A protein has these predicted regions:
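Short N-terminal binding/cap micro-motifs at the start of the first secondary-structure element
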Residues: 14-22
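Short, surface-exposed acidic-centric catalytic microdomains
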Residues: 45-67
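N-terminal glycine-rich phosphate/adenylate-binding segment common to multiple enzyme folds
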Residues: 87-119
Length: 319
């Protein structure tokens, strides 16, 4: 098991000059801020199937039968769909250790959503496609965190994606070390507040599932189901309302330890966040201060307080 999360990435986003026009789309956050904390596995599917750099632009063509094909824009009958599908079939089984994948938006091979579709006559259609390589990856690994470069400029989506990367990495490490009922229960306990912040209905559904762990003889089968449920919950970005519920829940742990002035101050800070007057870091910082003064083993174990390295500063941009 790697000592850092391994993240797949479209090669052009690393600065490699592999785009159809011979250029790249190097992303500063990815290559500067995030790079010290992950190991990248870059791939350009179009180069991987033997296409040159530079090369004519490719398009997704929706046929009259509804099939999606990948063809050259200047030669609509020159089809590379089978080559791309064959590459995906060979390559995707080798990336099971990945904790996430960052793909290039709008690409006919890598785009995650809203890729332009064309008809067979070359007329522009809806932005409703998914790149062939990414579509195959999403089908094979539905739990894998996948995000586009453009969407990572959104602070909420960026924070959510990075949190999912580190969650899946920790879960995969648990499996690599050898599964036990104790380790699975301890993992879930650590993630309770994080899950509650992301999706309350999912949190309520996964709890009884974990409570029935003793009924499972095959722990790996349980792991597969649990991974699916966990990552589906975390896919929902944490909302202000859910964050507020979690913060108030944590506040209750300090009811007896704090004096009336401290309790009132903490409540005002949480309500200030709920009203949008304060950033999420305001109540979190105060709660961490009280946790240092009044240690609680359960709270100290919670992933919610540090779902990824604090030095990434992802919550600084979340209001």
């Amino acid at each position: 098991m790697n000592n850092k999360p391994v993240v797949g990435i479209s090669g052009c986003l690393t600065g490699a000059a592999v785009r159809f026009d011979g250029g790249h789309k190097r992303m500063d956050f990815v290559m500067n801020s995030l790079a010290p904390w992950v190991d990248y596995k870059p791939i350009c599917p179009e180069v991987a199937i033997g296409l040159p750099v530079p090369r004519p632009a490719l398009r997704l063509i929706q046929t009259t039968c509804g099939d999606i094909r990948m063809r050259y824009s200047h030669a609509p009958h020159d089809d590379v769909t089978e080559r791309m599908n064959a590459f995906a079939d060979r390559f995707l089984p080798t990336i099971g250790e990945l904790a996430g994948f960052i793909v290039c938006a709008k690409s006919p091979s890598c785009g995650m959503e809203r890729v332009r579709l064309y008809d067979e006559k070359g007329n522009r259609g809806r932005k409703a496609g998914t790149g062939l390589f990414t579509a195959a990856m999403m089908d094979k690994y539905p739990w894998l965190p996948i995000e586009e470069d453009g969407r990572l400029h959104d602070p909420v989506l960026r924070e959510n994606f990075i949190a999912r990367i580190f969650a899946l990495y920790e879960l995969n490490a648990l499996r690599a070390q050898g599964l036990s009922r104790h380790s699975l229960l301890a993992f879930h306990s650590r993630y309770k507040l994080q899950l509650l912040a992301h999706h309350q209905a999912g949190y309520r559904e996964i709890g009884p599932f974990v409570a029935r762990l003793h009924e499972w003889d095959d722990l790996d089968a349980f792991f597969v189901r649990y991974r699916e449920k966990l990552m589906a919950i975390l896919r929902h970005p944490a909302s202000r309302k859910n964050h507020t519920n979690v913060l108030m829940h944590i506040q209750g742990y300090f009811h007896r330890a704090l004096n009336s002035r401290q309790r009132a101050e903490l409540r005002e800070v949480i309500l200030g966040y709920r009203a949008g007057r304060l950033p999420i870091l305001a109540p979190l910082t105060l709660l961490k201060h009280y946790l240092a003064e009044h240690p609680d083993d359960y709270l100290r174990s919670q992933n919610y307080f540090e779902p990824y390295p604090d030095t990434l500063g992802l919550r600084l941009a979340i209001t």
